[in-house]
Amino acid sequence: MNPQRRRRLWLVLALVLAGGLATTLVAMALQRNVAYLYTPAEVLRGEAGEHARFRLGGMVEKGSFRREAGSLEAHFRVTDGDAQLPVRYDRILPDLFREGQAVVATGRMQQGVFVAEDVLAKHDETYMPKEVADKMGSAHRKHQVAPAKVTQ
């Protein structure tokens, strides 16, 4: 093999290795920052992972909101119609946050409580993220009872 071909071969190998390394680093960075969306029922079944960072989607349960006196710390429950999960958040809540409204919170589970780092609220229940609507819809369909048959 002549020196020019050998140099080209080393250059091609170096480029392939650099491309592979760059792809690996990008994939690792993306995987670390991905937060999957789960409903309360899925979290309680253990699908989210014990120490994983994830998004929790559902509706703020009516009558569940309370705020610690003299503090920003808020406590509320998120429900998907199937299960409820307590949430703790210690920052300023969005202006659109209300009981009975759709919410998506990002955070981690700690001792049975979802500790939110970020909370997004929707202005009414007619719009919610497609993933949350689909998951809540399946929970609601699961609980519907077939109409009774009338016998004569």
From Swiss-Prot:
Gene3D superfamilies: Nucleic acid-binding proteins. It is found in: Cell inner membrane. Belongs to the CcmE/CycJ family. Heme binds at H123, Y127. It holds the Pfam family CcmE. SUPFAM superfamilies: Heme chaperone CcmE. Its main location: membrane. One of its GO terms (biological process) is cytochrome complex assembly. It is a single-pass type II membrane protein. This is Cytochrome c-type biogenesis protein CcmE 2. The chain crosses the membrane at residues 9-29. Residues 30-152 are periplasmic. Heme chaperone required for the biogenesis of c-type cytochromes. Transiently binds heme delivered by CcmC and transfers the heme to apo-cytochromes in a process facilitated by CcmF and CcmH. Keywords: Cell inner membrane, Cell membrane, Cytochrome c-type biogenesis, Heme, Iron, Membrane, Metal-binding, Signal-anchor, Transmembrane, Transmembrane helix. One of its GO terms (cellular component) is plasma membrane. GO terms for molecular function: heme binding; metal ion binding. Residues 1-8 are cytoplasmic.
